[in-house]
Amino acid sequence: MARGKAKEEGSWKKFIWNSEKKEFLGRTGGSWFKILLFYVIFYGCLAGIFIGTIQVMLLTISELKPTYQDRVAPPGLTQIPQIQKTEISFRPADPKSYEAYVLNIYRFLEKYKDAAQKDDMIFEDCSTVPSEPKERGDFNHERGERKVCRFKLEWLGNCSGQNDDSYGYRDGKPCIIIKLNRVLGFKPKPPKNDSSETVEIYSTMKYNPYVLPVQCTGKREEDKDKIGSVEYFGLGGYAGFPLQYYPYYGKLLQPKYLQPLLAVQFTNLTTDTEVRIECKAYGENIGYSEKDRFQGRFDVKIEVKS
């Protein structure tokens, strides 16, 4: 029995290192060198093929503009303050109840302050009235970075924070700031003023062919009587986004780009009642989706507590 164990142990040790044949794990040094060389060459070739494939693919992709944009969804419409569950609830007499909303708006608007738009090499004045889209050449590096239109805080009126640092929340007249999300090369097409839908829209706001209109209304029938009056503050006094701020050329060509903003103030919401509000952009190339609640529109619930 002991002799059998010794024999088994000896064969195991001999497999690891055979001193007679100079073999390690059943292979000589030359054999190990050949097999290692084979795998180095094999995996090196695989890595080369992979890297070559990636390089060829990268040659077809522009770092400035997506090659295919036909399936890019229309831009989303979002509001500031950005809040969870899109619910704003506060008590005007309690600053703590609306502090987070005010701080959110303040931080967002910091880049729109005059001090942040002083550099004339980057920013330019693009008129105080809406005008046609401002083309800035092709999507390439030949002209370097493209200039950006200035957007002045004063155009946001009561919601600019210049005269009321609570953005209306202290008085129970909350403001929200609306923006159209950035989509590379997107040029909004305002609706023509000849359909039944646009006639209804423009019955409550000024029409301009160079403004993409936005309207905020009660979402449900019971909300329409509770929303009260709605005031809009934007460039030129129009309720929408002026076209001269489009198209957007991307972070590489327009790193300091400022989206045009629209401020909306609800001046006499019914108190102690949750009012559901829908804000919606209207345009020929603005779409809506039940799967994406922010595509071209958004809902927000506001409750002003007494």
From Swiss-Prot:
GO terms for biological process: ATP metabolic process; cardiac muscle contraction; cell adhesion; innate immune response; intracellular calcium ion homeostasis; intracellular potassium ion homeostasis; intracellular sodium ion homeostasis; membrane repolarization. Keywords: Cell adhesion, Cell membrane, Disulfide bond, Glutathionylation, Glycoprotein, Immunity, Innate immunity, Ion transport, Membrane, Phosphoprotein, Potassium, Potassium transport, Signal-anchor, Sodium, Sodium transport, Sodium/potassium transport, Transmembrane, Transmembrane helix, Transport. The modification Phosphotyrosine is found at residue 101. It is found in: Cell membrane; Apical cell membrane; Cell membrane, Sarcolemma. It comes from the Eukaryota. Residues 191-306 are annotated as: immunoglobulin-like. Pfam families: Na_K-ATPase. It is a single-pass type II membrane protein. The keyword rRNA-binding does not apply. Disulfide bonds join 126-149, 159-175, 216-279. One of its GO terms (cellular component) is sodium:potassium-exchanging ATPase complex. NCBIfam families: Na_K_ATPase_bet. The C-terminal lobe folds into an immunoglobulin-like domain and mediates cell adhesion properties. This is the non-catalytic component of the active enzyme, which catalyzes the hydrolysis of ATP coupled with the exchange of Na(+) and K(+) ions across the plasma membrane. The beta subunit regulates, through assembly of alpha/beta heterodimers, the number of sodium pumps transported to the plasma membrane. Plays a role in innate immunity by enhancing virus-triggered induction of interferons (IFNs) and interferon stimulated genes (ISGs). Mechanistically, enhances the ubiquitination of TRAF3 and TRAF6 as well as the phosphorylation of TAK1 and TBK1. Involved in cell adhesion and establishing epithelial cell polarity. Belongs to the X(+)/potassium ATPases subunit beta family. This is Sodium/potassium-transporting ATPase subunit beta-1. It comes from Cavia porcellus.
